[in-house]
């Protein structure tokens, strides 16, 4: 067989195989619901936008989503559809590092979500959501090398109880109290050696009463934030 005929046969094989492969994707069932493997491309390109499998209109298994960047695309997210209606989601950077991961139901984040520092395997933020998609539970933020930087408690989307800030050496440097998502109660600031440098009280997000500033264990400044009306109503 001549070289020209071999080339022709090879091209025909590629065309037939390509058509056959394309025929496996993007099918509908008798009710016009997407069914079987699907693969969609960015308009006018051969760059895949997403791929996954449908079962009579419902996503099943793992879907892959790609982000276009000029003439290339890269894996930007995976979604694993579970039988209980939850979706396990992972977002990726261009460098194939995990950006964040957690579960969703519909548009709502639920359960524990973890976010990572840029181009790193170190956790940046860990937080928990309730079934309505609002923050609920302990939220923690970390320094790039893994030390805890901040911790606060949420109850159905609102900060409650104690919020703590930490220096990289683990020392508490700020301590606040929250009630119904407002600063309410005693507040204290410390340096990274644990020495108190500020103390005062909040009432519904506003400073109130006597605030004190410290240096080397001694008070160096005081200021009274007690509210005093400028005008008294006539009797």
Question: Where do the model's predicted regions map?
Answer:
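Bacterial Sec-dependent N-terminal signal peptides
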Residues: 1-25
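Glycine/tyrosine- and acidic-biased, solvent-exposed loop/turn segments at the edges of beta-strands
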Residues: 19-235
